[in-house]
């Protein structure tokens, strides 16, 4: 690769890995924010929608799904706050960002699906913010290392053995 086409301050794969570590942390925060957004969109939808002459938010299963969504978002927030504390303390490693990215993206994916469910058919309409959150969840789940790759990074830290070939 000619010198003119090289990224500045990137001299080895270790430099690339450091960039990915930092980006995974950012993605974990993004996933957490979108997770709260999906929950809030669903909560707002059920607050103004009626079904069978009753507020949609009064149905037991809708309330259970809202509770599940808020729990997912809150757990994600705890994970990224801890990640930030690790960064600030200088004890931040690849597996920390991989774990946060993997966990928050999975919680987002689940929360977006639940939000879509409580909105029924309106949850798949493109003008509905729930549909946008659902699409964002799929993208976030995949970029800056797929769920599987990040799981292997975590597994390597747990076992001391790399599954990468």
Task: Enumerate the language-model features and the residues they cover.
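Generic, well-ordered alpha-helical scaffold segments in large soluble proteins
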Residues: 41, 45, 86, 114, ...
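Glycine-rich beta->alpha junctions and the first turn(s) of the following alpha-helix
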Residues: 1-74, 139-140, 156, 165
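Amphipathic alpha-helical coiled-coil segments
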Residues: 107-115
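Alpha-helical scaffold segments that form or flank carboxylate-/histidine-based iron centers
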Residues: 58-69, 94-103, 131, 136
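Glycine-rich phosphate/cofactor-binding loops in nucleotide/flavin-utilizing enzymes
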Residues: 119-165
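C-terminal helix-coil-helix/basic helical segment that borders enzyme active sites and/or dimer interfaces
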Residues: 47, 51-54, 70-103, 116-124
